Every structure is written in C-alpha cells, then in structure tokens.
Amino acid sequence: MDAQIEKAIEIAWDPRSDQNLKEQAVQYLTQVRGDSSSLQACLNLFTRDPKAAEVVRLVSLDIVNNAIQTQHIDDQSLRGLKEQLHDYVRRTYASGNEVDPPALQNKLTQTLTFLFSSLYKEGWESFIRDFLSFTGHQNGTVDNLPGVVLYLRLLSSIHDEIADLMIVRAGGETKRNVELKDLVRARDVQIVAGSFQHILTYWQGNNDAIVEMTLKVIGKWVSWIDISLVVNQDILNLLFPLVGRNPNGGEDKVKDAAIDCFTEIVAKKMKPSDKIGMILFLNLGEVVSQLIASPALHDLRNTSSYDTDLAEAVAKLVNNVVSDLVKILEDTKVEPEVRAQAEQSLQTFLPLLLRFFSDEYDEICATVIPSLTELNTFLRKAQPLPPAYSAMLTPILNAIIQKMRYDDTSSYADEDELTDEAEFQELRKRLQVLQKTIAAVDEALYVDVLSNVIGNTFQRLDQQNGQIDWRDLDLALHEMYLFGELTLVNGGLYAKSQPSSIAAERLIVMMSKMVESGIASFNHPAISLQYMEICVRYCSFFENQTQYIPQVLEQFVGFVHHNHSRVRIRSWYLFHRFVKHLRGQVGNVAETIIQSISDLLPLKAEVPKESDDDMSSEDGSHDAADVAFNAQLNLYEAIGCISSTTSTPIEKQAIYARTIMNPLFSDVQRHLEQAKSGNAQAVLQIHHIIFALGSLAHGFSDWSPGEGKRAGQAPAKEITIEFSRAAEAILFALEALKSSSEIRNAARSSFSRLMGVMGVAMLPLLPRWIDGLLTQSSSKEEIGMFLRLLDQVVFGFKKDIHEVLNSLLTPLFQRVFASLSEPVTGTDDGIQLAELRREYLSFVTVILNNELGSVLVSEQNQAFFDPLVQSVTTLAKTVTNETGNLAASKIAFSVMTKMAELWGGPTIATPGQPITSSVQPQPTFPGFDTFLIERFHPVCWEVLREPHFRPMVDAQSKSVLNELAGLEHVIYMKTGNMFVEHLQGNFFPSMGVDGSGFIKSMVESPERKGLATFLQNWLKGRA
C-alpha cells in the first residue's frame, strides 16, 4: 500500500502526467484520505529512511494530519502515531542529522500540535518535556539548534491552537482548550518559563533568529501564564539589553521583537493595582524615552534611514500603556493611591504618545490614535476637569492640528500620489473626530487655539505679501472649514442679524479676513478649492455681509476658468451652489455672468471607444468626459438661478433664457438627422442638450406643484412661454429618437424639471411625453420611474389634471400592464418587476387619494376598470416569498380599501355597535356592494389560506394582515348585515370553516387592529 500511495502522489503532483492518469491518482488519494487503515502507510512514507520525495512526505503527513484533526482515528492508533513520530524526531532533530525542509517542518509542527491537543491530557503527559530534551546534546544545555527551533515552533503552535483569542472556536473546542491551558499551568509552565531564560542566555549574541523566535513565543504565552514567570529580574536582565541594542539605527528584528514582547506583557489583563505596579516596575516611561532619544528614532527621524519598524513597535507599546492607564482612571473603584500613580504615569506618557502621534509616517500616527481617542473620551466625561487634566488639552489639540497639515514632501494631486492623497484625507477624517472631542471638552480653548492658528496664518500671508507655504495656508483653511461646525450646531452664524455665539463671531471675522486677504488669487489648486468650499459652506455670512458678494462672484468667474482641471470641474458645482443659496442677494448680474462664462457652455459629447469596457476606457477618459459633462450642467443651472433673481425684470429673464436656449435648439436641428440614422455621437449630443435644457429650467425655478408654502412662486407667463419652446424641442427629439434609452432618460429627467417653469402648461403635453417615454423598448425600471414622476404631477395639479388624466389613463395602463405581464429573465429583472408593481399601485393610490377616482370609472376608461381591478386583486393575493411580493400586496389591499371607501356608499354599520338590519347598502354605482363582497372579500381569505403567509413570524406579512383586516372592516361598514348574512349562509359553509369567531370580531372590534389580532391568532391555531 505504501508503494501505491507514493506512486499516486508522484503522478498527481507531476505536471507531465497524463491528465486521465492524474485524475485517477487524485481520486485514489481522496479515498485514502477517508480510510483510517491507510494512515500507517502514510506515516511510514514520512518517517522512512531512505527518505521519500518531499512532496510525497508532505502529502502523506497531511493525510495523517487530517485524520487526527477530524478524530477519524482510534486511541490505539493515535498512540502508535505518537511513538513513531517521537522516534522520528529523536532520530532527526536530536541527533544533529540533516533536518527537514521548512515546509515539512511546518507540517510536522502542525501534526505534533494536533497530537498534543489529543494526548496531553492523557497519553502524552510528558510532551513538552520530551521536546525540551531535544534542545540540548547534554543535560541542562540548549545548544542543539534543530531541536531548539522545533521546540520553539511547537510552543508557538500550541499557543495558536489553544490560546489565541482572535480565533473563533466552537463551544466544545473552547472547553477543551481551557482544560489544556490549566494542565500546562499545573505541569509544565515553570519548565517552559525556565527554558525561555536558558535559550535567551545561550543564544543571545550567537543566533538572532533564535532570540527573535523566543521573544515572540514569550509575547504569546505571557497572555495566559503567571506574569511573575516572565516579569522577574532574571528575564528582564535579558530583555532590557535587547531593547537598547544597536542604538545607531538599521533594521534590527530582535530589538523590534523585544519591544513587541514588552507590549504583550503590558497588554496582559490584570487588576489595576497590579497593572500600574508592573508599569512602574518595568520603568517603561524611561525605557520609551531612551528609545525615542536613540539615533534610530531621533537623529535619523527626517531621513531615509529612519527606522519605521522600530517606531511602530514603540508606538504600539505606548498605545497599550496609555490605554491601560485610561482604563485604570475610568474605574471608579480604584484606590486613591493607584489613581494617583496612574495620573502621574499619564503625565509621563502623554508627551511620548504625542511624539508618535505627530510622526511624519501616518501608519505610525495611526498606531496611537486608539489610545488618544480613549484619553479624549475620558477627559470629556471627567467634567469638571481638574487642572492636571486641563493642561493636557492644549498639547493634544496642537498635535492634532499639526498632523492635519500636508507633509513637506507631499505634492498635491500628482498622478503618482493619488493613493497617498486619499489615505491622507481619510486620516484627516479620523483627526477631525479627535478634534471634535476636544471641542466637546473645552469649547473656549478650542475656539481660541483654532482662531490663533487661522488668524496667525492670515497675518503671515499679509506680512509676507503672499509668500507662504501652501501647506500652511491649506491647514488654516481646512481648520476654518471645520471650525464653522460649532456655529452650525448652534443654529447658524446669525440670530436676529447678530452673531449667534462666540464661535460665530470669530468665524465672521475669519470670513472677512479671508475674502479681503487675496487668498483667492493664491496660485495653488488646494487653496482655490478650500476657498470655494468655505464660501459655499458659510453662505449665510454673505447673506448678512452682502458687500462681499460681487468680489466673490468675480473670483468664482475666475475659478470656473481655472487651468487645473480638478479645480475647474469642482468650481462649476460650487459656483452653482453659491448663486443658488444667494439668489436673493446677488442682484441683477445675469448679463455680466452669462458673458463671462459663455465660452464654457458649448456642449461636446464624447462617445466611448469600441474597446472601452463598461463604458469606461483604460485611461479613464470617458469617465472624465462624463464627470465634466455632469459638472457642466451645474453652469446651466447656475445661469438659471442668476437669471431669475427677484431684482431681474421678467422681460430680461425671458431674454436670458432665450439667449441660452436658442443655440441649443439649433444644435438639436443640426444633429437630429444624423442621430436618426444611428450616429452615436449625434445621439449623445442631443442627450446632452436635453439635460442642459432641463438644468437651465431647474435653475429658473425649482418650484414643485403642490408646494403650498411656495404657491406664490408659480412660474411667470413669460418664462412659461420660453420654456414651452424647450419642451417642444425635447419632445421633437424624443418622438424622433424614442428607441434610444439615452434620449428617454434625458427626456424623463428634463420632464420633472420643466414642471417648475411651465406649471399647468405641461398638462396638455402629457400624452406626447407618455408616448415618447413609454415605448416598446422601455424597461420596467424606466416605466416605474416615470410613474413616480406622474405621482407628483397628479398630486400637484389635482384641480387641473382631470380631463388630461381621463384621456391618457387607458393608454398609460396598457403600457404598464404589458410590462407587468412580461416574463422575468433574471434577478435584476425580478427586482425591477417588483419596483414597477409598487409604483403602479402607488400611482393608483395617488389618483384615489386626490379625489380623481372618477377617472378610473369614467365612460372613456370603463372598459379598463375590470382589468385594473383584476391586476390589483392578483397583486394583493400574491404573498409568496419572491422579491417585493409582500410590499406590493400591502399597497394593493390599501387600494382596494380606498375603492371600498370611495364607492361603497355611506357607512351603514359601525363596528362595536348593534347591526341595523333594515338599512340597506347604498353604493355609488349599482351593484358595487355585491362587487365588494364577491370580488374583494374572497381575496382576503385566499391570502389567509396561503401556507407561505406567516404574519406571526414575518413583519411584512403582518403589515399585509393589517391592511387585509382594514379591507374586511370597510366592507362590513359599507354593506352591514348583507355581508354578515353572506358569510354565515354562504361563504364559510362552502369553505367548511367555522366563521363565527371572525364575524364576532369584525362586528365588535371598533378598530381594524382588533380584527387583525383575531386573524393572527386564528392563523396560529391553524398552524
């Protein structure tokens, strides 16, 4: 069998093997892996002499490994494996013979670790001592290198297997590991700790790799053994020289490992008094101070030889110490003496923490952010702050602010540094959180420090005639941007034309200085962007200080022409935001602005190349074109805002609109014939033009019909006339190119924006919009989005839309029903179908809720009423688990309830009160009472009898049940005794169901909730 397994492994791992033969070999090895009788053969292949090929030995031992780990081996065989492997290790690792390659050593370590887990409790109690004995050629020595390496590998692997808290384990495995750790502590921990000392003593200065391995093992084991076994003078006398060695720099893994070892020692959980005692005993403050002062971390700090690994290791140690000190101080039960010691230690460690926090390397800074966050949180809670704590705030805040600054070596927005830039902005966000915490602790200090930083920078800019490092100015502007958040919390900059707070007062001064300082002309893209962002964020300043608006507008005109693409593109959006906020204050400047930026308005569509994947080319050029176009739309909207200010006469507004739109109309005519013949560039050009027209309209008026508070802002007639031309141009293009999804999407977007400038003038055009937007090729998603737009139109123009809605309803529903009936072709299509169902039902709901229900039953739409009801009832009773079914069912039941309320006639039965049998239903339409009982009511019980419908355990189903109960309630209220008699004499008997409980609950429950509760309990009983 040994030979068969060996041959199979050789074939399976030989790339030259025949594929069929290789498959047979793999299949055979799979059988071997599951056959416990083959384990001895596999072990023989690993241990035999002469040795088999490395791959044969590796695979064979892996099969043994798998059997031990999965417990597919009996105790007798397990002990046999133990004896054979123990003998192999003695022959190979204790005798000085040639040892196994690294990969086999790893696999052997893994196998022995599994044997430890299985046999250390009973069967191999001497495991650790046995392998320790292999570390020396004579008793008491540890001079056998192969044996020492294997011993340390095993100790490390045992920790990983039974004590690593980062690994999630099953309950039984956790219990086993606890028992094993207890056994190790009782039997061998003293021996293990002693071996650490012996190995370090013998190999220090002889083999750094062994010393590094030993330190890493100590760092692991210290978390679960008695700390005194490691923190004692003998061990420390060996550790401290390692921490302090090689002070002149250069990579030193042993030194880093020694520091990491201290870090793990500090991280060990213990009582506050013991923890502070250990920190003081180890004299860690002095140790860290000496490390920081060493040439490796001090003299070489700003050079390429700076030891970042060492810095990160020491920073991690400092982070752990400070975190522990904060936890001690947070503990209200700590003794006064311990608290005093912790406070003193914190004073010692804060400068050390800030040293690494302010490190030029962000990775090192990030290492100590967790403990600094904990410290700031502690200070925020420790109100009122004692003087010793208050004194900490200023150095912390100064360090945070300084860390916000770009490094001297950084180059803003270079292509090669975009990743670094993104990482720095992420760091700034983390620093902002820390800064906010300081503001929460002492707002007055925060205001003073930031005011000084910003004010001093502006002063230097003035004194040095603009000759200042852009990084300093960027820092001041960034802090100014953040500083204003204090004013936003307090309700804005002004209260009754006066500064709302001290922070607001300071920001107002900063804003004035910023605008007056000439920063806008500072030649650096980061400064230009920061300046614009601040102007937009604190627009309320300009609402009160209007004298600055012309100057800033002129500056924006410069920014929108900036030679740096990032600044230029971003400025188009920010310019729009600025004028939109201040349209009431900018005055009659439209003509000047239009002339100044007219060169930026021409649209130029760029079609992606055929080689582009997913509409984006490798060099990102198409993405850039998309970004530029979307930003360009902001210019059109900005012109709309400026052109429609209250200080601009209506006649002038119309002229400005015409001036912008006429070139766009000509452009449509110029490209339409090419677009109709399939020219992609022409289609995209018209797509861009349609979007631009919509953006201009939105700038003129973002008024939405139905906004009661803004009813007076309905569009002026002159403006409506101008934009009616835009609507005609868009419809003209849409009707010619409605097969293009790009054109439909652009038209749909512009449709919603034209509503604001056209008002009721849009209504007669609705049939043409529907014909163009809802075509044979329109997706379910497109139809759903358009129905959502129609919801707004119906709601906004409910007094004017009746006739138009009446005429377009049947063709609209025909398009919707055709799409609803299409087969689902995939997951995305299923999601779109669910969304379309919801939008369709919501549209019907809007019609019913806005007193327009008569259009559903008008003479013109009467033929479509039955298909409408059929579709609603079908969706109501579809409650299976497919995407969106329950959401649609809920809306469908609410639609049926609304129909019952509208057309069921007056209420003739009040739940909770006696039935008056003499009162007959009086529906709005003859026979609608019977319709409710025979068409709507059975739908409720189809749902209730659906096995998948489980409102007891599903929240969405419960919502459906609530709507269902509401429908039954309304049917009863409209039909009274007629409904009860139908239930008693016909419906329930035909179902073979005792409906007396249902009838009683329906009649006696004053609200639908009572009936819903009854039905839920009834369903529970059925289950």
Curated annotation (Swiss-Prot):
Pfam families noted in UniProt: Exportin-T, Xpo1
Keyword tRNA processing: yes
GO cellular component terms listed in the entry, alphabetical order: cytoplasm; nuclear matrix; nuclear pore
A GO molecular function held by the record: small GTPase binding
Main location: nucleus
Subcellular location: Nucleus; Cytoplasm
DNA-binding recorded as keyword: no
GO BP: any one term: tRNA processing
Keywords, alphabetical: Cytoplasm, Nucleus, RNA-binding, Transport, tRNA processing, tRNA-binding
Function: tRNA nucleus export receptor which facilitates tRNA translocation across the nuclear pore complex. Involved in pre-tRNA splicing, probably by affecting the interaction of pre-tRNA with splicing endonuclease.
PANTHER family per the UniProt record, alphabetical: EXPORTIN-T, EXPORTIN-T/LOS1
Family of this protein: Belongs to the exportin family.
Full protein name: Exportin-T
Organism name: Sclerotinia sclerotiorum (strain ATCC 18683 / 1980 / Ss-1)
